[in-house]
Amino acid sequence: YLDVMIIDFNKMVEELGSIETLKTDFFSNVSHEIKTPLAIIQNNAELLCMEKTPEKQKEYAEVIFQTTKRLSELISNILKLNKLEKQAITPVAEEYDLCGQLAECAVNYEPVWEKKDIGFDADMEDSVKITADAALMELVWNNLFSNAVKFTEPGGTIKLTEQSDDSEIRVSVEDNGCGMTEETRKHIFEKFYQGDTSHAMAGNGLGLALSLRVLQLNDYKIEVESEPGRGSKFTVIIPKR
């Protein structure tokens, strides 16, 4: 009887795995089909924003542009996540300066911080080398910065810290925003999970899931510290090899 139970259980696991694969493939196929017409809509909306058109029409065009931009980002993240989960991405590991990469990512967010009146502090070494896929790691830093901006109120501060010793490098992105409950922390790396529904329109719940897959691909770790009303701190741990 026990043998039959084990066989039935294994069969159920296989079926659930097949359902998950079908669901992921469906998302991927639909995303590919939507990508091209969405790009056309986005490009035309951008052109309308630049044309000499009445102010009200420009406002409508801007709404279309921003909405299609968010959808494009969602589709890109779905496709990347699908490839990572299927292990269809082979990381191209090369040695590069991590501090230089972090500085470049931070500079890209300067206009956003200024617009939202958010302070930024950085505490890093002059240079530290790692061997990894730079393009994939850039996704991680951009997602962490994007999250920090999203949940930090005007007048708040975001802090970037990089430290290293003989065994590992630790990179932290910390904000003093709304923070998270313990329940949210448990699920924060799950696909499409959004703990704070008041910020639902600002993201799609895929950024941290995507970041985790990239880090797992490199055998890196990520830790989260957070308290409601006191902000959040994400720390990526990169072992030295």
Give short role names for the model-derived ranges.
Residues 66-71:
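Short alpha-helical segment of the dimerization/phosphotransfer core of two-component systems
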Residues 219-222:
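Conserved glycine-rich
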Residues 180-192:
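Short conserved segment of the HATPase_c
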Residues 92-97, 114-115, 119-129:
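Conserved catalytic submotifs in the C-terminal HATPase_c
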Residues 49-55:
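Short acidic helix/loop segment immediately C-terminal to the autophosphorylated histidine
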Residues 1-22:
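Amphipathic coiled-coil signaling helices used for dimeric signal transmission
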Residues 148-149:
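Short helix-loop "hinge" at the ATP-lid/N-box region of the Bergerat-fold HATPase_c
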